[in-house]
């Protein structure tokens, strides 16, 4: 069995590539970083340190190779593999779709009918379904029947924390023991691959939003609040009592939306929040706030980790004040090394805060949602001082 993994970063190597290799796949990584591509091809293996609650261990990941995403030979690889996975970030999916489309055309022209399943592992709800629509848009209509018969696009939810830690070995990674990979079993074409610890669900939306509204929401809010106070790591941020209360309360507010929407058990969900907090506190998984907070425009989109639960609270007439504080902190964020942060700050300066919120978050003009964010923005430094 062969798999092509787009993205050889932390999640790509430390979670997906590792899991696929442990499941017996030969894994080909595709990335635009030629240094990483060369390192994988030179070593043909890499090491991952797993941080557990009781003990740590290091595992050796074998059967790996790599190719640059711009290499024309990638279409041949796409036509021959059994599985494609991605961990490139939601904004890069459209570029990946163009590459996949060329591979599918090559597969069709060579009359290959072996089913191919594609799992986009991104922080975007139904990212594989989105990827499918982009592929269909670029694929000639005469090939659509082939795609619908032989190409599966499987939506999923992934959950793990892999911090950015500087190592002498460019391929070495440190990961947490906790990992979750839940997929929609109904979307596979052909035989369902046997992948270690992969879970199947018929109600994937609930699990996708549970992870997005809890881990991602809490992570982002802790980062943006922490950066205002010049903290460096997630552990520093949640050690601050005021920030800790806001983050925990925001996660409970987003949790109330999940409980209402999906009929989750309240006590079970509070336990889930507690587990997330314990993961944030793990000193061996120290994660830099600048990494967590990067790309604020993406994180402030209507369907992402901050605005979506916030709007859910309005939808069900539930508390939202701490979510609003977190969103306000995101608009406060400025990092001269982050292009999206620079664009965000420039928009606030030129167009004003209100217009920027309306545009980026796709919120109604003169709405309570917008004014609640503005209110918290004007108070944010006093709140966490």
Curated annotation (Swiss-Prot):
Keywords assigned: NAD, Oxidoreductase
Known catalytic reactions: D-mannitol 1-phosphate + NAD(+) = beta-D-fructose 6-phosphate + NADH + H(+)
Gene Ontology CC terms: cytosol
EC number: 1.1.1.17
Pfam families: Mannitol_dh, Mannitol_dh_C
Domain of life: Bacteria
This protein's record includes keyword Protein biosynthesis: no
Residues annotated to bind NAD(+): 3-14
Annotated protein name in UniProt: Mannitol-1-phosphate 5-dehydrogenase
Species the sequence originates in: Buchnera aphidicola subsp. Acyrthosiphon pisum (strain APS) (Acyrthosiphon pisum symbiotic bacterium)
Gene: mtlD
């Amino acid at each position: 069995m062969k798999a092509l993994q787009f993205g050889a970063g932390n999640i790509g190597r430390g979670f997906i590539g590792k899991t696929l290799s442990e499941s017996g796949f030969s894994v080909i990584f595709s990335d635009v970083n030629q240094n990483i591509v060369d390192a994988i091809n030179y070593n043909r293996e890499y090491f991952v340190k797993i941080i557990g609650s009781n003990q740590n261990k290091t595992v050796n990941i074998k059967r790996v190779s790599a190719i640059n995403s711009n290499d024309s030979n990638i279409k041949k690889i796409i036509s021959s593999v059994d599985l494609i996975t991605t961990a490139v970030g939601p904004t890069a999916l459209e570029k990946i779709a163009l590459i996949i489309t060329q591979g599918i055309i090559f597969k069709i022209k060579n009359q290959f009918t072996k089913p191919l399943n594609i799992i986009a592992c991104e922080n975007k709800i139904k990212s594989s379904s989105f990827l499918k629509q982009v592929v269909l848009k670029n694929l000639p209509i005469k090939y659509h029947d082939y795609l619908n018969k032989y190409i599966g696009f499987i939506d999923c939810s992934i959950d793990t924390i892999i911090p950015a830690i500087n190592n002498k070995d460019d391929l070495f990674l440190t990961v947490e023991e906790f990992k979750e990979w839940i997929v929609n079993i109904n979307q596979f074409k052909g035989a369902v691959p046997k992948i270690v610890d992969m879970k199947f669900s018929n109600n994937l939306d609930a699990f996708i939003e549970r992870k997005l509204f809890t881990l991602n929401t809490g992570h982002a809010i802790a980062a943006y609040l922490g950066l205002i106070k010049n903290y460096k790591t997630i552990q520093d941020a949640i050690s601050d009592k005021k920030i800790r209360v806001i983050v925990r309360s925001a996660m409970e507010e987003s949790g109330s939306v999940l409980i209402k929407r999906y009929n989750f058990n309240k006590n079970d969900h509070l336990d889930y929040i507690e587990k997330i907090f314990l993961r944030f506190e793990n000193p061996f998984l120290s994660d830099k706030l600048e990494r967590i907070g990067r790309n604020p425009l993406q994180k402030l989109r209507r369907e992402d980790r901050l605005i979506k639960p916030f709007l859910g609270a309005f939808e069900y007439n539930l508390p939202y004040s701490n979510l609003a504080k977190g969103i306000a902190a995101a608009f406060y964020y400025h990092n001269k090394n982050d292009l999206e942060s620079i664009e965000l700050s420039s928009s606030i300066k030129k167009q004003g805060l209100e217009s920027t919120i309306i545009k980026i978050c796709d919120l109604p003009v003169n709405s309570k949602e917008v004014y609640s964010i503005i209110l918290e923005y004007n108070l944010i430094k006093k709140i966490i001082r």
